Curated annotation (Swiss-Prot):
Top class in the EC scheme: transferase
Protein's name in the database: Anthranilate phosphoribosyltransferase
Residues where Mg(2+) 1 binds: 93, 227
Family per record: Belongs to the anthranilate phosphoribosyltransferase family.
Organism: Myxococcus xanthus (strain DK1622)
EC numbers: 2.4.2.18
Amino acid sequence: MTLKEALGKVVGRRDLTREEMTRIMGLMLAGEASPAQVGALATALKMKGETEDEILGAAEAMRACAAKLSPRADVVLDTCGTGGDGAHTFNISTAVAFVAAGAGVTVAKHGNRAVSSRCGSADVLAALGVSMERPHERVARDIDEHGVGFLFAPSHHGALRHVAQARRDMGFHSVFNLLGPLTNPAGARYQLLGTFDGKRVEQTARVLGRLGSRRAWVVHGHDGLDEISPCSATQVAELREDGTVHTFTVSPQDAGLDVVPREAIAGGDAEENAQRLRALLDGERSGLRTAVLLNAAAALVVVGLAADLRDGVRKAEQAIDSGAARNKLSALIEGGLS
């Protein structure tokens, strides 16, 4: 199938097969599509509505192009979400990565610089002193030796440069926004994945299962957050080890936590968020701590280190208050200096 044939099919509101989408995405990532073609296809897919097979095929093509790592650990967690919820909150999933690592989880945090917010995971980590120029073998050592590593998306997904201009020109969410959490270069098979689109929660969990993930929670707050919201109930699609997907809702109260106001988790620029992340890992009590405890608890449930959210909160609190989570951040910073 050619790009023109694919575009004609999608414009006619016909779905691409998994194999067709893999081929077309492969052509785009190889630089064989013009920005106009990339933008037209992404727009047509969005207007039609991307199917499970189309997202799966696109993710498989992107995984095939990635610079991969192979951590020694069997259980590896990613907390990467789609971003793009427009809420401009603090980097909750980034903080969760260090808390989970402090609790004993091996974490391969996939992330990028900000797209729609003021500060993405790469921005806050760079402000903290984590190098974005780490060689891949150094990142692999971070994961194996320290239990946490940061996989800077542009370093591992260089082929995305071929679609970058079209994505900037489009200015809206497209299939590309869905792919980051589905294409962890370390092959993490356990995930806490927040999505900006509540309609995609169950679909995304099914795609993860077909991609080989073992367990995952895909979450979307009823208030629109692409996290487990500390401010409201949250929709969850849980991928279980048998491949089944179960949906339910959770609330802060389920974890023994109080609801916090949205302003408690508002984000700032990279320097401000870096200061707040340090304070959080130093044990500061705040609404932000509540948000991180709630999401870290879910991460611990996903990997099997916590029986339920309340148990997860207790273990996340211990990881922070013992200094273990802070030590994980310090190790990542110091590792980039060696």
